[in-house]
Each structure stands twice: as C-alpha cells, then as structure tokens.
Amino acid sequence: MNQRLVYVVSDSGGETAELVVKAAASQFHASPIQVKRVPYVEDKTTLAEVVALAKMNRAIIAFTLVVPEMREFLLAEAAREGVVAYDIIGPLIEKMSHLFQLTPRYEPGQVRVLDEDYFKKIEAIEFAVKYDDGRDPRGILRADIVLIGVSRTSKTPLSQYLAHKRLKVANVPIVPEVEPPEQLFRVGPGKCFGLKISPDKLLSIRRERLKSLGLNDQAIYANMDRIKEELAYFDEVVKKIGCDVIDVTNKAVEETASIIMKKLKR
C-alpha cells in the first residue's frame, strides 16, 4: 500500500499548519496519514525541492507562507508539476484585509508575539533539530551558538539543553575525512565552542555505544589510534577557527551549558 503523506511547509515553525493537517488527518483512522514538517523556508529553491518530493511520493502539500510572492511561487510550481497544494493561511489573510480594510504585515512568525518566551523556546528547539550534526551548514551563521567536536562528545544533547534556554544552536561533527564547512571559519570566535574529551573517556563511551547497538565494540569507530587521529584533527580545526575549547571529559551537559552561557554574557 502506498504511503499517504502530507508535507507541511512554513516560513515559520509550522506548528499552525501541522495542527490543521493533523486535525484533518484524524478523520481517517483506518488509513493513517503521515505528516512531515518543512519549517523556516526562506527561498524558492526549497519550495521547488518540496514540490519535487511531493510529486515523487504522490503527496499533498499544505502550507502557511505569509509572503505573497512565496505563496504564488509554490502554487504555480505545484500546478505545473500536478501536485496538490493547499494554502492554509493565505486566503484568510486576504479576506480579512479586504473586509476590514487593513494592510497585512506579511511577516512570518507573528503569532509568536502572543507568548514570546514560550515560542522562542519552541523555535530554538526546532532550530537545534534542523541544524543538528552538520546536516545543513546554512544554520551555522544563523545560530547563537555553534558547537563542534568529534562523535560522542554530547553535541546533540547539549544543543537541545541550550535550546530550552531559548538559544539557537547548530552543531557540526569534526571528522578527518570531511572538510569542515566554510561557514565555520566565518563564525565569530565568541559564539563557537569546541568540545574536547580525553581519548580514554571517548573510547569507553564509543564502546558502550556500539554494545548498546549490538555491534562489535572493536570496530574502527572505537579504536584508540583512530580516536587519537580524530582528536588531533579536532585540535587543528579549533586552532584555525580560534574558538573556545571546553573539556567535557567529566562534565554533565548542564555543567557545560552553564560554562557556555557565562562566556556568552561576557
């Protein structure tokens, strides 16, 4: 059976559109409908990519894009590709504007003004998810904080913890075989933090990780020579960037976060 899929596209967090889509999808208990959110869309290239995915997966696109140019582009692109695209917010904005003789601001994310603190936290959490593990280097220059380190140095849990403090965090893994994204070298040193760890501690953590996955704990991932190679490369990268380095060997995530936040306040 083909999957039933709806892409939820938004120039903000996408919570509004997702709630509407899930409310509609809840009427079809016998045939579950999967919802995939695509938040913080800022360019037409991303819209075109979503349309291509929707066409390939025979999916529907539901969207909240407040900028008319972006709405019109998505609707035109979807029509050209034979994809169903449903505008959740646009028609209502236009009706309100016409009936009440008001001019819309056409600015994404205005609903967050209703509860700025709460929504800042949600936005930061979503940011941390979107820009986790170096998956999109565009987030590096948009972040309040950038974390770098080799695998298993708590980059992801630390990013999430800081996100709950309403800080937008991107994290980037440092791997000898992969050139760091050029954006890393354009970040101000005051917002980039390298997470350092002792070889012995990292070896122990990685072996436990492999065991938990049911894998051989003697794999190259948990080899001491490999670990030393990764840490040496990490040292080269942080030296080139000139960022602060925090030793996380025996630190809890909360302790590391506290150090980072104190440094940010300087």
Swiss-Prot record:
Keywords on record: Kinase, Nucleotide-binding, Serine/threonine-protein kinase, Transferase
Pfam family, one: Kinase-PPPase
EC top class, as a word: transferase
Domain of life: Bacteria
Molecular function per GO: ADP binding; ATP binding; phosphotransferase activity, phosphate group as acceptor; protein serine/threonine kinase activity
Binding site for ADP: G149, V150, S151, R152, T153, S154, K155, T156
Cleaved signal peptide residues: none
HAMAP family associated with the record: PDRP
Family: Belongs to the pyruvate, phosphate/water dikinase regulatory protein family. PDRP subfamily.
Functional summary from the UniProt entry: Bifunctional serine/threonine kinase and phosphorylase involved in the regulation of the pyruvate, phosphate dikinase (PPDK) by catalyzing its phosphorylation/dephosphorylation.
Record's protein name: Putative pyruvate, phosphate dikinase regulatory protein
Originating organism: Geobacillus kaustophilus (strain HTA426)
Native organism taxonomy: Bacteria, Bacillati, Bacillota, Bacilli, Bacillales
